[in-house]
Amino acid sequence: MQRVTITLDDDLLETLDSLSQRRGYNNRSEAIRDILRSALAQEATQQHGTQGFAVLSYVYEHEKRDLASRIVSTQHHHHDLSVATLHVHINHDDCLEIAVLKGDMSDVQHFADDVIAQRGVRHGHLQCLPKED
């Protein structure tokens, strides 16, 4: 491990210290390493041909104009990416789905975009993890 020096403006340093404290880091270096790893992983997922895993989560109203069947159709269209799906009934109207995906990150992103863009889907979020060698 090597030691490096960086210069941060006061506001950014205060934000880093606040984040470090909230997340329970022992020091700034640990926080900065995790932030950098996250940024590098995100960058890697944007490169064409990158293989990896992802978690897609979203909420939708199951009774809304064939939305559930459209989502299932989209999932079947991209069946090669799906590892598992968890379906949770939040209340009488809303469902939460969490899909674990595996494959080319550009295909995963395309699938996520297709699901999240469906009218009636809310709180869509894709978390990508590039495959580590």
UniProtKB/Swiss-Prot annotation:
Its biological purpose: Transcriptional repressor of the nikABCDE operon. Is active in the presence of excessive concentrations of intracellular nickel.
User: What protein name applies here?
Assistant: Nickel-responsive regulator
Q: List the disulfide bonds.
A: none
Cofactor stoichiometry and binding?
Answer: Binds 1 nickel ion per subunit.
Q: Which organism is it from?
A: Escherichia coli O127:H6 (strain E2348/69 / EPEC)
Q: Which GO terms describe its biological process?
A: response to nickel cation
Give a yes or no for keyword DNA-binding in this entry.
yes
**Record keywords, A-Z:** DNA-binding, Metal-binding, Nickel, Repressor, Transcription, Transcription regulation
Which family is it part of?
A: Belongs to the transcriptional regulatory CopG/NikR family.
